[in-house]
């Protein structure tokens, strides 16, 4: 884990869960909604490019992945058949999407001085029921956790109250809905971490 990459999270919380749910990664369209400059947006883009999936980063201008990384992923996509799109219109981005993925808007010890500007910029990219309704009817919601979906935690309450919101990056009704696979996603961390440990620490041919 670092600011720019979250490789293990992509292995465990994302692609394994998607494959379990849909049976395959083929033809899956994943939309990353929010700040796509950092570890989850970057790593999901790399993973989707390698897996031949359809990836869309939906973000405000200035919140997209680094151009050099995008170019590297486009080169990979040319070999795997993946597609990469970068849109600023949430409604257009999620049309027919199979997976809607988001992450918290401020993290990794970022100073409070960035909160107001960041939240104002990303507020239109909140994942809510209206947005999910524009995706494929069988779409799933994913989040690497923790999520600020209500005011029941100290930090969630602080941020929502401070900025006059009931939820931040995802609403509680979506987080708790049948479309949400966030806890299945979290469970899969254990299994893929064990696989990585077996591959790197044990004398086992996988």
Say what each PLM segment does.
Residues 1-7, 11:
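Single conserved hydrophobic/aromatic residue that forms the stacking wall/gate
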Residues 7, 96-97, 178:
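Short, well-ordered alpha-helix to beta-strand connector turns
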Residues 12-22:
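Hydrophobic alpha-helical segments within soluble ligand-binding/sensing domains
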Residues 16-17, 47, 172, 191:
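Active-site loop-to-helix "anion-binding N-cap" substructures in soluble metabolic enzymes
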Residues 20-102, 108-110:
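Glycine-rich phosphate/diphosphate-binding loop of Rossmann-like nucleotide-binding domains
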Residues 75-172:
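Rossmann-like adenosine-cofactor binding region
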Residues 160-206:
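C-terminal helix-to-coil terminal segments
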């Amino acid at each position: 884990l670092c600011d720019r990459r979250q490789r293990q999270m992509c292995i465990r919380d994302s692609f394994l869960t998607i494959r379990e749910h849909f049976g395959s990664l083929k033809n899956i369209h994943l939309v990353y909604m929010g700040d796509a400059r950092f570890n989850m947006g970057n790593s999901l883009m790399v993973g989707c490019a390698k897996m031949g999936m359809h990836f869309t980063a939906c973000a405000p201008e200035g919140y997209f992945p680094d151009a050099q990384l995008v170019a590297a992923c486009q080169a990979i996509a040319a070999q795997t058949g993946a597609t990469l799109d970068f849109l600023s219109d949430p409604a257009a981005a999620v049309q027919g999407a199979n997976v809607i993925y988001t992450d918290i808007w401020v993290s990794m010890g970022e100073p409070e001085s960035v909160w107001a500007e960041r939240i104002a910029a990303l507020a239109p990219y909140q994942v809510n029921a209206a947005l999910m309704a524009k995706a494929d009817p069988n779409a799933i919601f994913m989040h690497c956790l923790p999520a600020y979906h209500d005011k029941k935690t100290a930090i969630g309450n602080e941020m929502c109250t401070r900025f006059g919101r009931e939820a931040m990056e995802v609403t509680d009704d979506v987080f708790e809905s049948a479309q949400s696979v966030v806890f299945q996603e979290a469970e899969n961390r254990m299994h893929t971490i064990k696989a990585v440990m077996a591959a790197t620490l044990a004398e086992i041919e996988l």
